[in-house]
Regions:
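Sec-dependent bacterial lipoprotein signal peptides
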Residues: 1-4
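Cyclophilin-like peptidyl-prolyl cis-trans isomerases
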Residues: 6-220
């Protein structure tokens, strides 16, 4: 799932899921994370989330009226701790940084088809710092997000409806590692298919310089 040219990767043989992740990349999984159909709480009209990352902290402010379905999904994911230990697996200078594939293949499998409806454009643009769900086509948004590095107004009206904005710490977002570039198969970066099936073990082994989220928490 991509932020632009947003088709899923073509179907390819998937490596077997490791029986057990190495202790160094083990991901905490709660029972609630495995039941996406119950993560349906309505988000507040406006709320903030603080991301603690390997490069520092940044805060996102969400406005539900910008994109109600997107805001509700994000709110529930944060409450579940879904983004904890997730990697920023696709970062392209001047364009955007993408994240939101859970580090546990078990969890990823449960959410892969937990789609939410598209939100109609509500006057918000994919400007610098805007936070938006990635999509693979109409009504296919699940858990992947991106933060815009530049003005990507060309994405407006294509199903990429921003639901929030980086309120502070954009310098941290700017500093996230971008050296791997575009993901496979178009580029040399991580394969989303392999992240889904192998989780953080694959990323830590083959892309060790990626930055990651330590925690994402709701704040006042």
């Amino acid at each position: 799932m991509f932020a632009a040219a947003c088709a899923r990767e073509s179907a390819q043989p998937s490596p077997a899921v490791p029986a057990q992740l190495p202790a160094s990349v083990a991901v905490q999984v709660s029972a609630a994370m495995l039941v996406p159909e119950k993560a349906t709480e309505q988000a507040p009209a406006v709320f903030k989330t603080k991301f603690a990352t390997t490069k520092g902290d940044f805060t996102v402010e969400v406005h539900r009226d910008w994109a109600p379905h997107g805001a509700d999904r994000f709110y529930n994911l944060v409450k579940l701790g879904f983004f904890d230990d997730a990697e920023f697996f696709r970062a392209i200078d001047g364009f955007m940084v993408q994240f939101g594939i859970q580090g546990s293949p078990q969890v990823s499998a449960k959410w892969q088809d937990a789609n939410i409806p598209d939100d109609p454009a509500a006057g918000q643009s994919n400007k610098r710092g805007a936070v938006t769900f990635a999509t693979a086509g109409p009504n296919t948004r699940t858990t992947q997000l991106f933060i815009n590095y530049g003005n990507n107004a060309n994405l407006d009206g294509m199903g990429f409806t921003p639901f929030g904005q980086v309120l502070d710490g954009m310098n941290v977002v700017d500093s996230l590692y971008k050296g791997y570039g575009e993901g496979a198969p178009q580029g040399m970066g991580p394969s989303q298919d392999r992240i889904q099936h192998e989780g953080n073990a694959y990323l830590k082994k083959d892309f060790p310089q990626l930055d990651s989220i330590k925690t994402a928490r709701l704040v006042q």
